[in-house]
């Protein structure tokens, strides 16, 4: 029995130890830094919870499965960790790799780097291209010499201020605006940062810097850089720099990039004679003279500026790469001496002569698309070319390119040129000049205006003049291993001489003019009573000829002198309200809408207020003077009907006239009240003041019944009679209409709203917080200890 009890006690103690050690591994992350160890073998995927990281650690630790267990000794063997581009989202578990000196978590999806905070043996960290914003966990890693964090979401770099052993720090493509934390990192030799920085003053003491990249910031003042005399490389692209004077002292520079700034004057660069790599693209530079002495240059980028003269480059014979694209170049002869060039860009310029490149036999890549080059015979000896881009030029003959057998990339599309003009005739024929690399003619793909092709000529039969004809070509070509489509459009202008006749009221003169030219304007003709308007392509109407811009068309034309007739004003007066029309002499007036006037009929427009002559808008013509026409009216007559109990008489009266009052009618037993505009009630007509309206009316005779005394019977009170003879019935009480006891006030509600206590919804009903959940472990351990003590006591008593 005692042995069984001992076995039971041992089992409990073992369970406590196993449970406790498991909890220690899972909770040690939140305790003291010294607890970042595991006390027993643990599966890899329990230490490194991120699936991708667990898979990587399985390989690093030499295991076959992520469920395999490892010890702290195993973890301590890991000193470097290359885990880039694995899609890792969490680095939990890395805190147990206490001997790490180098890590690479680049190109993952990290946001939290807390597990690194106590890995003080780290000397190099690469975590670019993640989503990291908080770098506080790096604050104590003072052994770091290299830190790469570009392309993250970092704003605050203050945690780096004590990392004084850093000699490489890469912080580009973040949201950093303040770099004051860097001022004490005087061991830095390589530095790049931010994209919102404006002030470079914190760099003043970093005199050991050799490579500095301040690209994509908002920097305009670079005066502090004059103190960094050890700089060998300065990259300052995409800023707001216009003055580079402070760079004149940095004579150790061998690489300088100022691409994408606001530079016009580059005179300071003349002193930087150690430069081998210079990028000045995307600025406003036109004068290259300061570069003439930079003879060590091997790479020079000058694209997208305002350069037309490249003669200062003629002596830079060490150049291997030269970019001159997107400028204003026509003459490229100075590059003929740059015989070490292997890479040359000339696209988007105005170059027609490419022959200066003929001596550049080391060229491997040549780009001159979007120029005006027609002759490529100078390229025949450039047999080292492997990339040729010559689209959008005027090339018609590919024969000179046949020997460029090393080409792998080729562009010859969209050529376009215009031939010299030929005289127009009904039948036009021109030779086809487009040849492929074998010298064979390439037949047209399309021909305008119904043209036809019989090798070697393209022919058009033109029934009427057209200013140009054209044809296109398109054929796949292969040169070396490069294949492209050689395509383009050829335009043939046509010119012709045509007659222009000038007509002045039947008289004409004739001149010959070449189509497309401006006409010489004749002297202005004169016509009595008219003003000369100009020359038009029709006797009336038409389009006026503009001698400054209109060019002779491709046919005979007639131009007519047109004159404007003097115009006059007709005023229409309607009782003082006027409108007007302007009409040419002898022109017809447009009849206005007939005006209206209450009670009147419009008679017409007259040349006098009263009387005068009526204007006939169909035949009367505008005289040679201004006129006024007056609206005249005649008053309308309306009928008044007098109705006496259905019998009527009438009167005809003009609008606003007074009616003659008829004799008062009589009616037995009644008294005549007057004439009203309604049979009953209505308004009584006042014959002294009321005027005839603009409509017929009816007036009704109204009477009042004479009063009659009724007999008195039975003591009843007779009904009263009103003035109109109507009996007024006695008032009647309406049943239920007594409102004397009705209250009109609002009754007070006997129900009140009470906020009763609700034990199920009360916020105070929940239990208070008792502390963190780790107390459960200690309660369990306590209970087990008490149980053990009780068992031991019982055992001791039993042994006595």
Curated annotation (Swiss-Prot):
Domain LRRNT: residue ranges: 36-76
Variant or mutagenesis effect after changing residue 94 to L: In strain: EGD-SmR / Serovar 1/2a, F4233 /Serotype 1/2b, F6789 / Serotype 1/2b, F5782 / Serotype 4b and H4
SMART domains associated with the record: LRR_SD22, LRR_TYP
Record note on what altering residue 369 to A does: Increased affinity for human CDH1 domain 1
Region (Disordered): 705-757
InterPro entries tied to this protein: Cu-Rt/internalin_Ig-like, Ig_E-set, Inl_IR, InlA, InlB-like_B-rpt, Internalin_N, Leu-rich_rpt, Leu-rich_rpt_4
Signal peptide annotation: 1-35
Assigned GO CC terms: extracellular region; peptidoglycan-based cell wall
Residue ranges constituting the LRRCT domain according to the UniProt record: 416-505
Recorded consequence of changing residue 387 to A: No longer binds human CDH1 domain 1
Phenotype upon changing residue 142 to S: In strain: F5782 / Serotype 4b and H4
Effect annotated for changing residue 573 to E: In strain: EGD-SmR / Serovar 1/2a
Description of how the protein assembles with itself and partners: Interacts with host (human) cadherin-1 (CDH1). The formation of the complex between inlA and cadherin-1 is calcium-dependent. Mutagenesis studies show it is possible to increase the affinity of InlA for CDH1 by rational engineering of InlA residues.
Domain notes: Consists of an N-terminal cap, a leucine-rich repeat domain (LRR), and an Ig-like interrepeat domain.
Protein name: Internalin A
Organism: Listeria monocytogenes serovar 1/2a (strain ATCC BAA-679 / EGD-e)
Chain's gene name: inlA
